[in-house]
Amino acid sequence: MTWRSDDIWIELITGSRKISNFCWALILFLGSLGFLLVGTSSYLGRNLLSFFPPQQIIFFPQGIVMSFYGIAGLFISSYLWCTISWNVGSGYDRFDRKEGIVCIFRWGFPGKNRRIFLRFLIKDIQSVRIEVKEGIYARRVLYMDIRGQGSIPLTRTDENLTPREIEQKAAELAYFLRVPIEVF
């Protein structure tokens, strides 16, 4: 979502609370829970899953391996659920021509650096840069080059923008900030 006036441009950034992350976390949780239940059923010799007889899988080595995969999957699933609940990567980009300041804010993982807040002067922005990598995994990323600071990505790498969309976004931002556009 973007909010824009004559002097201020605020762009909200979606973090890890995306439908695809919810789907992957749920699928991974259910699959790993199934693996763990099958491994536990083979160890106990009791049927914990009604549609799967435990006698078909012996505990050593199949039951151990399935239990290991189930536990590993639960750890990965809990990591995904934590990133979703903390909304890692969300935030905003604020460009204020009136004050001459650019503020970039992102939420990180809990701890000392939970809040990532970068502040720059607009006069320190050298250019808006588009980096394009074509191929099977095409990638188009919009960067802001800051004098003495390097490049700061403004779009996520998984944000699959078409060439027209990324060009339009770069042109609007460069026009708003009154800086040149570079394409790599």
UniProtKB/Swiss-Prot annotation:
Pfam family for this entry, one: Ycf4
Keywords: Chloroplast, Membrane, Photosynthesis, Plastid, Thylakoid, Transmembrane, Transmembrane helix
Transmembrane segments: 19-39, 57-77
Primary residence: plastid
One BP annotation, GO: photosynthesis
Keyword Lyase listed: no
Keyword Membrane applies: yes
Protein location: Plastid, Chloroplast thylakoid membrane
One annotated Gene Ontology cellular component of this protein: photosystem I
Signal peptide: none
Membrane topology, as annotated: Multi-pass membrane protein
Known role: Seems to be required for the assembly of the photosystem I complex.
PANTHER family documented for this protein: PHOTOSYSTEM I ASSEMBLY PROTEIN YCF4, PTHR33288
Record-stated family: Belongs to the Ycf4 family.
HAMAP family recorded: Ycf4
Protein name (record): Photosystem I assembly protein Ycf4
Species of provenance: Solanum lycopersicum
